From Swiss-Prot:
Keywords per UniProt: Cell inner membrane, Cell membrane, Membrane, Transmembrane, Transmembrane helix, Transport
Role description: Part of the ESX-3 specialized secretion system, which is important for iron and zinc uptake or homeostasis.
Family: Belongs to the EccD/Snm4 family.
Induction trigger: Repressed by IdeR in the presence of iron and by Zur in the presence of zinc.
Origin species: Mycobacterium tuberculosis (strain ATCC 25618 / H37Rv)
Protein name: ESX-3 secretion system protein EccD3
GO cellular component: peptidoglycan-based cell wall; plasma membrane
């Protein structure tokens, strides 16, 4: 029974010109007993004095002998040699790297100073878990209500989805003021119920009208999220930019299908054209959306323009980061649009001509060659991923619809792409532009330009534009 008794030590603690005697556990780390010590020796923190509480949160405190250095927070009073009757001082831990911890065994040291012990479970983990639970429940409830609405056609399903969408949107807007990161996560999750609610709001069988309203809602909410100021806005500018561009493009494609009953091949060509336009204008649009100051070039004889305001110059680094994020979002949207267009063109492989297959392959090759132009790692990654995304989506679709020969062809394409990546990884010089001679660079640029130029005539031929002009 004596082994279960906790050893204590009676000490006097001096803090803020106040001497307090107390009995403390001798075998617990100081990190665990200091919060209680601070509450006892600094009573102002309990009386609502915000200054003491804030300073305690900003400056880490520890016990120390009079005139000595603070003890390590991972050491116990017994380890540092504190005995009954000692006088200790509660003082801040000096800034800089922490002193080596005091341990009695190397195995204890390996465990005490491991990453999991230095970053233990805390309130931040509980908050993240609560946020993840809220998002998961919202998404699962959205899936349930959408399924219920589609299966039964009852109005209650639509009202439930609309309620989830409104609650998610309001939560994202309101929580962003207090916790920007949590609010942004909720804003991203709100895209699903918003799109689902607007799509289900259109009566009738699922078709272009539902896609039009759902995509328009996703684009509108993405633009709203981009306009909301927050401390974490720069982290999600790329995501909402891509969502807005893809949503607007898909909405336009669905509107064209709704008005003119276009074939799926024409819709795919239109999406590829939109992807090309977004890619070409990505740099200009990103600078415009980041609100870069327009250059003022005076004409000969005009007075020299005044210097930009200091506040504008100080804000330029932030605008550069925002512009880079917008650019990554535009490139990601262009890649996703080209993937959607290629899949729409090749969705029926048995009815697709050689020209159609050339368009799919040329679009992928042009995106890969276009990656050499961009310095951003995110832009390069998206452009190089375009062939994989197209082949992967087609593989899943062909397998699901029983087109196993076409699915086997998609697997072969993925295998060839994988071998290409392995070869480049083993020979890094292939991916280094400096290793290419000037004639080879010109040849590569000529091939890329030829692929880009050939896309528009091929798409015009596929949609029947040439035949329409000749048969007028």
């Amino acid at each position: 029974m004596s082994g279960t008794v906790m050893q204590i030590v009676r000490v006097a603690i001096l803090a803020d010109s106040r001497l307090t005697e107390m009995a403390l556990p001798a075998e617990l780390p100081l990190r665990e007993i200091l919060p209680a010590v601070q509450r006892l020796v600094v009573p102002s923190a309990q009386n609502g004095d915000g200054g003491q509480a804030d300073s305690g949160a900003a400056v880490q405190l520890s016990l120390a002998p009079v005139g000595g250095q603070p003890f390590s927070l991972d050491a116990s009073l017994d380890t540092v040699g504190v005995v009954d009757g000692d006088l200790l001082v509660l003082q801040p831990v000096p800034a800089g790297p922490a002193a080596p911890g005091i341990v009695e065994d190397i195995a204890d040291a390996a465990m005490i100073f491991s990453t999991s012990r230095l970053k233990p479970w805390g309130i931040a983990h509980i908050q993240r878990g609560a946020l993840a639970a809220v998002i998961a429940v919202a998404l699962l409830a959205t899936g349930l209500t959408v399924t219920y609405r589609v299966a039964t056609g009852v109005l209650a399903g639509l009202l439930a989805v609309a309620g989830i969408a409104v609650a998610s949107a309001l939560a994202g807007l309101l929580i962003t003021i207090r916790s920007p990161r949590s609010g942004i996560a909720l804003s991203i999750a709100a895209l699903v119920p918003i799109g689902a609610a607007l799509a289900l709001a259109v009566p009738g069988k699922f078709g272009p009208a539902q896609v039009l309203l759902g995509a328009a809602g996703v684009a509108a909410w993405s633009l709203i999220a981009l306009m909301i100021p927050s401390a974490e806005r720069e982290r999600v500018v790329a995501f909402f930019t891509a969502a807005a561009v893809v949503g607007a493009s898909v909405a336009l494609a669905a509107g064209a299908q709704l008005l003119w009953q276009l074939p799926l091949l024409s819709i795919g060509c239109g999406l590829i054209v939109a992807a090309l336009l977004v890619t070409i204008q990505a740099a200009q649009l990103s600078a415009l959306w980041a609100r870069f100051p327009l250059p003022v070039i005076p004409a000969p004889g005009d007075p020299t323009p005044s210097a930009p305001p200091l506040r504008l110059l100080e804000d330029l680094p932030r605008r550069v980061r925002v512009s880079d994020a917008h650019q990554s979002g535009f490139i990601a949207a262009a890649v996703l649009l080209s993937v959607l267009g290629s899949v729409a063109i090749a969705v029926r492989p048995e009815a697709l001509s050689v020209v159609g297959w050339y368009l799919v392959a040329a679009t992928a090759a042009a995106a890969t060659l276009r990656a050499r132009v961009w310095d951003s790692a995110a832009c390069k990654a998206w452009l190089l991923a375009q062939p994989y995304l197209v082949a992967g989506v087609l593989l899943v679709f062909y397998t699901a619809t029983g087109r196993y020969v076409a699915a086997f062809g998609a697997v072969l394409v993925l295998a060839v792409l994988m071998l290409a990546w392995v070869v480049v990884a083993l020979n890094p010089g292939i991916a280094s532009p400096e290793s290419y001679s000037l004639p080879l660079r010109r040849l590569l640029g000529l091939v890329a330009a030829g692929l880009d130029v050939s896309l528009i005539p091929v798409m015009a031929y596929l949609v029947g534009l040439f035949a329409w002009v000749l048969n007028r």
